[in-house]
Swiss-Prot record:
Belongs to the PNMA family. It comes from the Eukaryota. The keyword Disulfide bond does not apply. Transmembrane segments: none annotated. One of its GO terms (cellular component) is nucleolus. The modification N-acetylalanine is found at A2. InterPro entries: PNMA, PNMA_C, PNMA_N. PANTHER family: PARANEOPLASTIC ANTIGEN, PARANEOPLASTIC ANTIGEN MA2. It comes from Pongo abelii. Residues 335-364 are annotated as: Disordered. Residues 335-353 have a biased composition (Acidic residues). This is Paraneoplastic antigen Ma2 homolog. It holds the Pfam family PNMA. Keywords: Acetylation, Nucleus.
Length: 364
């Protein structure tokens, strides 16, 4: 919605949105002179500009400023963020063909769906655009009208075509809405498998969740190898933003993890699995022997009753070792059987209790 705010602000100030920037995330207690000092240093490559206004954005608890560029500027020179005092300030700007490219993709999509632009506006509850007026409207105005229609339409507008990723920037000071890298990576690894689109579209959707250094890295790896896959992109993110834990450290951490007091064996195995996968990812443990290593560590690190020990020993001797789910099934079955036996023992009356149903009937 930041781009929509930029467009509305430019319209109010009667300035060209293609020659304007909006900088957000500025601490609320900053004076205009302090803001100018930071911007003059970080935006000096853009030439002369004019600060048109400042507003407070409640949802960010921070200020935003609008700048008008007074010289022709190479859009590639505009940074996506600047390092301000107290954190990163985001730079919002509009590319020259952003509206045209968007509308071209929109028209192509509507054609495939057998729909029209005017029909889409009607579905959104906006009656001001008809099939006769669409050809006469500029791309900029049409994009603006579409933004207005979507803003006032009932939610959700359409069923989700794909699950979106949470935001990740890789910045030293992450924004409140960002996920930690490990959480974002786990989510991304699973979700990209669900996207029923081409690799190129997957990379575009992945880039939509990125900001700052993370987005810069995405551009770098794609420029270096245009045919790079989404999985290879995620691998690059691991190399740059992932944990610095060494292979040896990952291996030792796994082998030194034991069942805790009061912890069920199944809970221990689940906790152990996270460490095993991390060790496999770092190639500290070969993937081909992961099942064997898992079984051996459970037998060494857990407190097992005799029945479960025998079952696991039998699985180890017979081979091949069970998978994670197969092992969990065996353990859960044994835990349920043990719990059932304990309940029966509690309910069974002790000798001498009850109504004497086993007394000899012939006794006087």
């Amino acid at each position: 919605m930041a781009l929509a705010l930029l467009e509305d602000w430019c319209r109010i100030m009667s300035v060209d949105e293609q020659k304007s920037l909006m900088v957000t995330g500025i601490p609320a207690d900053y004076e205009e002179a302090e803001i100018q000092e930071v911007l003059q240093e970080t935006l000096k490559s853009l030439g002369r500009y004019r600060l048109l206004g400042k507003i407070f954005r409640k949802q960010e608890n921070a200020n935003a400023v609008l700048l008008e560029l007074l010289e022709d500027t190479d859009i590639s020179a505009i940074p996506s963020e600047v390092q301000g005092k107290g954190g990163v300030w985001k730079v919002i700007f509009k590319t020259p063909n952003q509206d045209t490219e968007f509308l071209e993709r929109l028209n192509l999509f509507l054609e495939k769906e057998g729909q029209t632009v005017s029909g889409m506006f009607r579905a959104l509850g906006h009656e001001g655009v008809s099939s006769a007026t669409v050809p006469c409207i500029s791309p900029e105005l049409l994009a603006h009208l579409l933004g207005q229609a979507m803003a006032h339409a009932p939610q959700p507008l359409l069923p989700m075509r794909y699950r979106k990723l949470r935001v990740f920037s890789g910045s030293a000071v992450p924004a409140p809405e960002e996920e930690p890298f490990e959480v974002w990576l786990e989510q991304a690894t699973e979700i990209v498998k669900e996207w029923p689109v081409t690799e190129a579209e997957k990379k575009r959707w992945l880039a939509e969740s990125l900001r700052g250094p993370a987005l810069d890295l995405m551009h770098i790896v794609q420029a270096d190898n245009p045919s790079i896959s989404v999985e290879e992109c995620l691998e690059a993110f691991k190399q740059v933003f992932g944990s610095l834990e060494s292979r040896r450290a990952a291996q030792v951490r796994y082998l030194k993890t034991y069942q805790e007091e009061g912890e069920k064996v199944s809970a221990y195995v689940l906790r152990l699995e996270t460490l095993l996968r991390r060790a496999v990812e770092k190639r500290a443990i070969p993937r081909r022997i992961a099942d064997q290593v898992r079984l051996e560590q459970v037998m060494a690190g857990a407190t097992l009753n005799q029945m479960l020990w025998c079952r696991l020993r039998e699985l180890k001797d017979q081979g091949p070792p069970p998978s994670f789910l197969e092992l969990m099934k065996v353990i859960r079955e044994e835990e349920e059987e043990e719990a059932s036996f304990e309940n029966e023992s509690i309910e069974e009356p002790e000798e001498g209790d009850g109504y004497g149903r086993w007394n000899h009937e012939g006794d006087d």
